[in-house]
Amino acid sequence: GENGKVVLRGNNTVSLATAYNQYLKYHCNAHVSWFGDQLNLPATLPVPVETTHRIINGKYRVYFNYCTLSYTGAWWDWERWQREIDYMAMNSINTPLSVVGLEGVWYNTLLRFGFTDEEARSYLVDPAHFAWQWMPNIESFGGPLPKSWIDSHIALGKQVVNRQLELGMTPIQQGFSGAVPRKMMEKFPEAKIQKQPD
């Protein structure tokens, strides 16, 4: 502390959030986790006796995988996402996988390639199976995906990415894997598209 005050420093927003988390843990005996918080803070916040320096190792601290974002994250709303993004920052994450709303990218791209609304939505799988579609090894399972879901998750995805950027994170976005819907062969019969086995 300095002059009886708690002072947290960092060279970026994620470092500051990490410093805050360290202060809560090691000076206030508090805890923030996925499964619950213990934030019974003392009436007067303790001032550390000595300065503590911590270095965050690793330039890129990646978080999430496709399965986490399908099994659990697919059902999160904005409130839950805000908590998760804060949790990431408090735990030094600066490079999260960020694919909320990717179904909207696919939907709109397929429309531009001449798919109907029904065809584009039928290509997309249900939210619990997004991991397999994004990896990519599945299509048209559990659909068609409702347009209301697509629209709401385009908006949610923008909120998630904007918040991650505000905190100085670099979201990992899905690139094009080369996989296309099998229906592309009907729509573009001259194209050289290799069909994978069922």
Please tell me what each predicted stretch does.
Residues 31-33:
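Conserved short beta-strand edge segments in small beta-sheet-based binding/regulatory domains
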